[in-house]
Amino acid sequence: MNTIFDILPQENRETLHKKDQPDWTVPMLATLTDKRFSKENWIYERKLDGERCLAFKKGQEVRLMSRNRKKKNHQYPEIEKGLKGQEHDFIIDGEIVAFDGNVTSFSKLQPRMHSKDPDMEVEVFYYVFDIIYLNGHDLSSLSLKNRKTLLKKAVHFRHDNIR
């Protein structure tokens, strides 16, 4: 039987563990350093100035959660809508941002973060950078590179606000 996990090398598939989807998971946080570094297998990503958001999708239910465990569905209904139609159950991690020109702007996002009427506010985008859980499997044993491979396969970035 073919599964989405077949794109991983066999030794990585063997490390996956079946697990019920948790109600919460602590997001990994970046560590600031003054030292310059470079390693062949390291991944460098652009720093986005927005609101960290974990998305929990199970069936047709989507919960958008801040890193402080605050539900954000009401503030970002277009993100919720873009994730509802996805095929797989998952927990993904990303950043919700607003733009001022070509640059992400936290100050432009702030009114939207506390809005009671998000339809009247600025357009937002969800930049997804990690997948933590997929279809009944905890992915924490996988490298970030392998998780990103699964992320590209599991999440269809066809909705304009999901990137």
State the predicted function of each range.
Residues M1-R163:
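Catalytic cores of nucleic-acid ligases and guanylyltransferases
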